[in-house]
Amino acid sequence: MAVGPPDQIFKDNLTFDTFRELIIEKESTADEVADKVLEAKKALLPIRTLMTEFVGMIANLESMGNKTSQEKFLAIRMKLIELQNNIQKFSKDFQQLQPVMRTMDKFNEEVNAGEKKFFVQETLGYTQLASNGSAAGITKTSSGNDGNTTGSTANTMAMAKGLKKNAAGKPNTGTGVQSGPGRRNSTKKTGHTGPATAPTTSNSAASAAAAAANTPSLKQIPNTQPMQLMPGVSPMAMASPLNNISPQRKLTQHVNQSRENSLHQGVTPSASMITPQNILNMSAFDLNQNQTPQSLDNVNNMDLTNLDLDSLNMEFLN
């Protein structure tokens, strides 16, 4: 079985001289090679379309409410199989064209082709050009944004100037009507300092600042009441409520002092002399009186012979 020219071209280790002889020998060989290249090129568009449809089907899977789970599975399976078949066919055609591509690369490297040098018909260079165009568009946009930023900065400066004018001119409003020359001078100064038509943003900002200035502010009333220091209590102990709890030893000393003072005076502190320290002393003194142990003399005077033990319930001892 004789091997045709296309089969001789699409095989490994094909030299450029052999490739040129086969094309010159039969003109239809060049057409067959061109058809193979176009067939592989045309297979790309269906693959892209099927890929887009497959992704859209997966994304809208939940919206397919009129189909059962089995129908959804079969639809996705058929679309995936179709996509796989197209990819395999394109891979096979592209793999068949590899010898021709390698041969043309060797021709560019080894042979001094000059004007006959082989160039790829379509490369990724257009992507770089598009990227450069996008970058130029982005640069123009950023330049426009810079202009807008400059304009906004100018508006901000105008607003600040308007606020300063309002703040400076407000104290003079309550001083009365000025004389004629003074009014003319102020009018002239106002005409020189700003444009006749102020921006709307500046007017709104100035009115807002004037309204805020007219609003009465709440003044903080300082605490003029002096702090009353209790005797025997340091200022550090008054910082926290827990610090007011003194140890048992100090409490005993205060109780003893209060008892001595009350015994010497014979009266309790009056209502006009009530202080936190006196309250603590009185409560401690009352507690001490209630918990005062009985004297041992009272125990010695008890008559144990007259105790009646008949009423005691002794059944629990049995």
From Swiss-Prot:
Q: What is its main location?
A: nucleus
Q: Name one Pfam family in it.
A: Med3
GO CC terms: mediator complex
Cite a single GO MF annotation: transcription coregulator activity
One GO biological process term:
regulation of transcription by RNA polymerase II
Annotated disulfide bonds:
none
Swiss-Prot/TrEMBL keywords: Activator, Nucleus, Transcription, Transcription regulation
Which InterPro entries is this protein grouped with?
A: Med3
Highest taxon, organism lineage: Eukaryota
Q: Where is this region: Disordered?
A: 134-225
Composition-biased stretches (Low complexity): 192-217
Cellular compartments annotated = Nucleus
Biased composition regions of type Polar residues, renumbered to the chain: 134-156
Q: Which family does it belong to?
A: Belongs to the Mediator complex subunit 3 family.
Q: According to its UniProt entry, what is the function of this protein? A: Component of the Mediator complex, a coactivator involved in regulated gene transcription of nearly all RNA polymerase II-dependent genes. Mediator functions as a bridge to convey information from gene-specific regulatory proteins to the basal RNA polymerase II transcription machinery. Mediator is recruited to promoters by direct interactions with regulatory proteins and serves as a scaffold for the assembly of a functional preinitiation complex with RNA polymerase II and the general transcription factors.
Q: How does it assemble?
A: Component of the Mediator complex.
Q: Tell me what this protein is called.
A: Mediator of RNA polymerase II transcription subunit 3
Q: Organism, per UniProt?
A: Kluyveromyces lactis (strain ATCC 8585 / CBS 2359 / DSM 70799 / NBRC 1267 / NRRL Y-1140 / WM37)
List the top taxonomic levels of the source: Eukaryota, Fungi, Dikarya, Ascomycota, Saccharomycotina
